[in-house]
Amino acid sequence: MIYWKKRLLCLLFSLTLRRQSKTIYNMKKIILFSAILFWAVFSASAQNKNAQVVTWTTAIQKVEPHNLPPAPYLEGNSLRQIVEVSFGGNMVSLKLSNQYNTEETEIIGVELAKALTQGESAAIDESTTTALTFGGAKGITMKPGEIVVSDPVKFRMTPRMDVAITIHFGKASRTDVSGHPGSRTSSYIAEGNTNDFSKAVETTHWCYINSLIVNAGKKFGSIAVIGNSITDGRGTTTNHQNRWTDNLSKRLLANKKTKNLSVLNLGLGGNCVLRGGLGPTANSRFDRDVINQEGVKYAIVFEGVNDLGGSWNGEETAKQLIESFKTMIKKAHEKGIKIYGATIMPFKGNNYYNESREKGRQQVNEWIRNSGEYDGVIDFDAATRDPQQPDRLNPAFLFENDWLHPNADGYKVMGDCIDLKLFEK
């Protein structure tokens, strides 16, 4: 009897140990699963918190001979360029482009600082000067065609702040430059590797700078605007930042529902959609300048007038433009980007005008307004045309009587006519 009692006790003890062992094993699985789940949530949260969004950018092209940097040129010298950001941030990276160069460009050093005079001078708040690094190094040599991004650095930017980007060059070509001719903002070239710009030479072009990228939260995003000289700001006031995109940016920042959106001006003077024109066509650069920009949530397409202005058959060109716009819309939607079409403004009085080209303009605008292909419409035509003669610009908005580009008042009307609800979705 005692024997069987002992056997029974041993059996019960063994079962208890197995249950405890199984419980411990299950607890380990629960703890491991919880740890994995926590890591995944934390990682996703960190990625959202540190999502990269562009707060300023420009469209890069091969700089034409008449827009190249003046003497003393860039090699061995320092270049200070001023840009105005949309929203601010505390962790910033700079993208530089050597995309159209056939030679190497040597960068000895780069600094960011707060600019003090909106580009009217090279003055900076020296206490804000922050050196950038590239893979931990002070400088970098960009290979032909290369685009590089600096390491993120702590640098406080506030909304609409003017940032001075100072580049110290080693080897740099005089005639082979990637940049943006229509900066509408002053830049300054000083001799030598220096931060003394008191005797600097002033120019109004950007060279090599491409984007300022902010580590921002998931609530932040950007509106990429692809366009021609009317987006680039032909007719605005140098250093006043009064393009229509600037006005839109100010309105967005003042609206609680849209204050976390940057406006990226990717206009190029003389740009075409289909072929010819200045710089890469809108068709060829759409991926680079819109789809692949960090943080893009919305896009605006405002192109076509230069294609029509150089066409032999306005209605045939209109058909080709519409097909190109359909392709852009498809690409944007595949990336989850809402895309809006802007109507082509009138140009009677300019040498672009003839009846065939006007018919083409009306054809494109009719499609933009009524096809339903775009996610929304921005009607610049209606906002800027002469009420008495709708095939020409309102005379109050003329720049130098060219009957193509608006003046500062016209650009303000353009920025004001855009419904901000398009960007509250």
Language-model regions, residue ranges each:
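Sec-dependent N-terminal signal peptides
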Residues: 30-39
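Solvent-exposed loop/turn segments at secondary-structure junctions
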Residues: 100, 172, 229-233, 268-273, ...
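Oxyanion-hole/transition-state-stabilizing segment in secreted/luminal serine hydrolases
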Residues: 236, 268-320
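Catalytic nucleophile-elbow at a beta strand-turn-alpha helix junction centered on a G-D-S/GDSL motif
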Residues: 220-246, 269-272
